[in-house]
Amino acid sequence: MTVGDGDDIHAVGGSVRHIPVLLGEVLEALAPAERDIIIDGTFGAGGYTRAILATGASVVAIDRDPDAIAAGRDLEVQSGGRLRLVQAPFSTLDEHVESADGVVLDIGVSSMQLDQAERGFSFRFDGPLDMRMAQAGLSAADVVNSFKPGDLARIFGFLGEERHAGRIARMIEARREKKPFEGTLELADAIETHIGRAPKDKIHPATRVFQALRIYVNDELGELAKALFAAERALKPGGRLVVVTFHSLEDRIVKRFIADRADVATGSRHLPEAQARTATFRKAGGGVTAGDAEVAANPRARSARLRAAIRTEAPARAGDFSIFGLPKLPGIDRPGER
């Protein structure tokens, strides 16, 4: 994410100029002040954290990627005690600070992860079919080589919105019987050969499948939902929640959460009436998108959308996944999924 038109914020651990998407809008919505405690739940290359530190606020920065944490250690030392790095899923953000004045989340894979071939997030380079942000647990290769075709089709269809999900799943089943998939280019080439690619196609035929695998392997939608519940518990009254998403599935989760938590008239049938009718957030504007100049500087910003909300004094509600309308996926079990 290298966009922006002012401050020169460098990527942690590198010399590339790095300004995160919607930086100005994030700071405006978050409104960090001196002595505030802000949780950056998706530290990544440290762009938001650096900008927040520059306001005089302190930051608890969380990332489940050990490489991101290691790259940020110098910044932690330079911060004079105002930055604390935590290697953990951002869904646990309320476990690492007693209370916070703000929470910011930048959802999705970081440019640093995409640029490392050995992480297997992209087919721009050949690398192992991995995609694990935490570098532990089920890999993309495990999913591709062992899941039933019906389960693969469901993952590709829902998480990647891939219209050829069934065809691709059946192709994978036939190919892996001869030889398991191991590399990113191997899978990408197999999909392109099977589906084809017209000259007018702007994206590679494997793009949506790779997106689906990454989201599934890291349970990104579930982590986001749990992080929103955690932010509700962590934020002080008047504290601000700011979330930047890059995909309609992610944005839908954030939008539904804010709408549910700001709604004093109705609530989930699974919760006590008194709880359901207490607003724990109030909306702070609608979805904010990048301007033409930012999109021109960084095409990735085109899909970015920022949503924000302000915490009320009401006690946090119980986490209820039914408000998100997430479908049941193989190996993932959450209350309220259909």
Swiss-Prot record:
Example of a GO biological process term: rRNA base methylation
Pfam families in the cross-refs: Methyltransf_5
GO molecular function list: rRNA (cytosine-N4-)-methyltransferase activity
The EC number(s) this enzyme carries: 2.1.1.199
UniProt keyword Chloroplast present: no
Location(s), subcellular: Cytoplasm
Keywords per UniProt: Cytoplasm, Methyltransferase, rRNA processing, S-adenosyl-L-methionine, Transferase
Entry GO CC: cytoplasm
Protein name according to UniProt: Ribosomal RNA small subunit methyltransferase H
Protein source organism: Mesorhizobium japonicum (strain LMG 29417 / CECT 9101 / MAFF 303099)
Organism taxonomic ancestry: Bacteria, Pseudomonadati, Pseudomonadota, Alphaproteobacteria, Hyphomicrobiales
Name of the gene encoding the protein in the UniProt record: rsmH
